[in-house]
Amino acid sequence: MIKERPIPVLEVFGPTVQGEGMVIGRKTMFVRTAGCDYSCSWCDSAFTWDGSGKDDIRLLAASDVIAELETIGGAAFDHVTISGGNPALLPQLGGLIDGLHARGIQVALETQGSRWQPWFADIDDLTLSPKPPSSGMSTNWEVLDDIVRRLSEAGRRFCMKVVVFDDEDLAYAKLVHERYPGIPFYAQAGNDNLTETDPAIMLPYLVERYEWLIGRTMADETLRGIHVLPQLHTWVWGNKKGV
Amino acid sequence: MIKERPIPVLEVFGPTVQGEGMVIGRKTMFVRTAGCDYSCSWCDSAFTWDGSGKDDIRLLAASDVIAELETIGGAAFDHVTISGGNPALLPQLGGLIDGLHARGIQVALETQGSRWQPWFADIDDLTLSPKPPSSGMSTNWEVLDDIVRRLSEAGRRFCMKVVVFDDEDLAYAKLVHERYPGIPFYAQAGNDNLTETDPAIMLPYLVERYEWLIGRTMADETLRGIHVLPQLHTWVWGNKKGV
């Protein structure tokens, strides 16, 4: 019997609310995997790839991850979000997804869309979140096209999400929406203040960023079917980790 | 030819973001109808039923409503939310819904579930929002059961939403979720401060109310598949009307 490859896990926490995107508000548990092929300038989870979190990485079997989810979350959840880093680097996640489904638990996952995995077609709430110019990364459109094509063929519910910090990012968001017109599209106001800890400063600033994005998108005829959302968890918990 | 019955309209505005529930963040136009069979203690649109807005009511044909939506929203929208009051008091809304669909525009509607209309089955995003004890209203469960049964038979996407102000409301929310277990369920933190105009006071208060509701629901095993959301528009615009 071939030994299952373990999963590099950095955090397991919850239940909490999903703060972004297509299932915003959903009660969910989080599993955060280590490792990323990107290094976005404004990444809010840089410890997953910049080396600073390396001592916290645990190599766990899928069954261990599920056991830990059940220890922490008890019977209070039926939804798990796999986050990163880029979980799409890990072919071995298929076993975890199958194990969760076997327990009646739904699975959400977000990835930048730089790498395909066959288990994408099994994710209940899949978000492809290509990164805009402000990230410093560049999009491989051929790979992204291929992922969108495969998911569409599989008849799978998924959405596109672009984080927007400035007008250049917004132009990129429009490009993405025009390239994949049939796919539900989310624009998210970016948080470019990752160090502020005072909610009295943080909260009005984030609301102002969200209001800016609303102002830039509402009258735009190329963004008719758009959702515009904040990162709700940063409004509640600021830059705190593990909530 | 039978003359179409006009629609009592109080407000037409947008495009803006939907601030609540199953399509939170969605770019949408709003049509607010006059009249309600309820008079919730904390209603944020009491002008639709308490007489204070009666001089603003216009009796419009469906085609006039659509023309006004297009004048205000141009070609920048593909989604309209019909709100109230209780729009379910108006059998004549079917023509408006058909007219919007004919233009490729999706329609959302929220109602307390006190009255069935055949056009419920045509709504793209329908929210049934029975009112908890703090409203001072009482739920007719037979009517609500009947509406849920008809919508389920029609294979229509819809959800349940309960606004929660206190623990008694939360107990009611659980009752609703247990009664309709297969239906996507949203709990929404209530805004019991309808007069505050200072965002520096309003915003932290609303965040605190939302955090309270998260705290009361996350560990609860009877609320596994729940979404917990704020009224996002009140976080951005406070108690302002028409945004």
Describe each region flagged by the PLM:
Chain A
Residues 3, 10-11, 17, 27-28, ...:
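Conserved Radical SAM active-site core
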Residues 34-38:
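Cys/His-enriched microdomains
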Residues 6-10, 14, 229-232:
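Generic secondary-structure boundary/loop-capping signal
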Residues 21, 43, 52-55, 172, ...:
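Short linear functional motifs in flexible/disordered or boundary regions
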Residues 17-22, 39, 237-238:
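Short N-terminal binding/cap micro-motifs at the start of the first secondary-structure element
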